[in-house]
């Protein structure tokens, strides 16, 4: 049995720069889109004879839009840039934050001396990435992209490999 756990806590992600008028501007990003406070990955490998079972979990902590960029009046004129429906519709709200996100993957492999076969499922629960307002973060069809979320959904796979001994 082999267990691997890696967790990262984002203590600070910031930018300080001097404006044209000489004033100093400081921007803190931790906890915002792309800079969740916590990220983790855990895996378990159980090997028995020629079999290997893998379980992997990925975790992204909750995130929120920069408080300075939140538009408190975004629905004042019955407009939402996440869909064409009324702004009171839950599916049309301004998505400025996302809950924590976790996905699981599992695979099973059989290994011989010079070949192996494997199969598995990525994103076992078919968990979609959180909804996001693409006018405020990088996104496509109200889904955040480039932040570590799985955009493909559940995926099944088969692997086969053969080691050709060429003698050199």
Predicted feature residues:
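Gram-negative outer-membrane beta-barrel transporters
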Residues: 1-67, 159-168
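Solvent-exposed loop segments that connect transmembrane elements
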Residues: 14-29, 65-94, 131-145
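Residues that define the transmembrane beta-barrel architecture of outer-membrane proteins
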Residues: 36-40, 100-104, 113, 152-156
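C-terminal beta-signal and adjacent terminal beta-strands/loops
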Residues: 58-74, 109-168
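Outer membrane beta-barrel transmembrane domains
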Residues: 70, 79-98, 102-111, 116-120
């Amino acid at each position: 049995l082999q267990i691997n756990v890696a967790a990262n806590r984002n203590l600070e992600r910031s930018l300080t720069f001097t404006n044209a008028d000489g004033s100093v501007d400081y921007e803190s990003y931790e906890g915002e889109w792309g800079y969740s406070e916590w990220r983790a990955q855990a895996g378990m490998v159980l090997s028995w004879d020629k079999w290997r079972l893998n379980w992997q979990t990925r975790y992204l902590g909750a995130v929120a839009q920069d408080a300075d960029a939140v538009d408190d009046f975004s629905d004042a004129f019955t407009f939402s840039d996440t869909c064409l429906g009324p702004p009171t519709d839950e599916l049309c709200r301004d998505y400025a934050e996302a809950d924590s996100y976790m996905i699981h993957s599992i695979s099973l492999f059989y290994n011989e001396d010079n070949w192996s076969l494997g199969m598995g499922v990525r994103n076992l629960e078919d968990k979609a990435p959180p909804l996001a307002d693409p006018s405020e973060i990088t996104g496509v069809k109200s889904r955040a992209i480039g932040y570590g979320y799985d955009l493909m959904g559940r995926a099944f796979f088969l692997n086969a490999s053969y080691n050709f001994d060429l003698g050199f």
